[in-house]
UniProtKB/Swiss-Prot annotation:
Pfam families: dUTPase
SUPFAM superfamilies: dUTPase-like
Protein name: Deoxyuridine 5'-triphosphate nucleotidohydrolase
Species, as recorded: Klebsiella pneumoniae subsp. pneumoniae (strain ATCC 700721 / MGH 78578)
One GO term (biological process): dUMP biosynthetic process
Its EC number(s): 3.6.1.23
Function comment: This enzyme is involved in nucleotide metabolism: it produces dUMP, the immediate precursor of thymidine nucleotides and it decreases the intracellular concentration of dUTP so that uracil cannot be incorporated into DNA.
Similarity comment: family membership: Belongs to the dUTPase family.
Pathway: Pyrimidine metabolism; dUMP biosynthesis; dUMP from dCTP (dUTP route): step 2/2
Domain of life: Bacteria
Record-listed substrate binding positions: R71, S72, G73, N84, L88, I89, D90, M98
Cofactor(s) for this UniProt protein: Mg(2+)
Length: 152
């Protein structure tokens, strides 16, 4: 299913010097987001920084949201992950998409202008309405929590 989402270019380099987000293949779930920087940024081990993307989106449909996720190669090869682990973009947000990055690696990492730093995936949203009850219907699991189902 294809859904149109309004996007506003906040930095004129986006679409010119830095490509617009696109799906790499017909089966891709995520769109790459790029660091819209004037100069390279050095991210020291243990450091975090907030990177602009040069884009704003307005999803407008309350049955959708976007999540900003790490790129697997940055985390696995360089230890660079999202500072907030996952970013959630609500349907009514209209500000610039910013990406918090954290270097959990042992080496400094240089982020170049236009470098792909994260990916964005659109997801369906179900808004719940809570129903106050005194008890729940019994289940096999019950209140079993962390580690309850074992390792094998």
């Amino acid at each position: 299913m294809m859904k149109k989402i309004d996007v506003k270019i906040l930095d004129p380099r986006v679409g010119q010097q830095f490509p617009l987000p696109t799906y790499a293949t017909s089966g891709s779930a995520g769109l790459d987001l790029r660091a819209c920087l004037d100069d390279a940024v050095e991210l020291a081990p243990g450091a975090t920084t907030l990177l602009p993307t040069g884009l704003a989106i307005h999803i407008a449909d309350p049955s959708l949201a976007a999540v900003i996720l790490p790129r697997s190669g940055l985390g696995h090869k360089h230890g660079v992950v999202l500072g907030n682990l996952v970013g959630l973009i609500d349907s009514d947000y209209q500000g610039q998409l910013m990406v918090s990055v954290w270097n959990r690696g042992q080496q400094s990492f240089i982020i170049e202008p236009g470098e792909r730093i994260a990916q964005m995936v659109f997801v369906p949203v179900v808004q719940a309405e809570f129903n106050l009850v005194e008890s729940f219907d019994a289940t096999d699991r019950g209140e079993g929590g962390f580690g309850h189902s074992g390792r094998k």
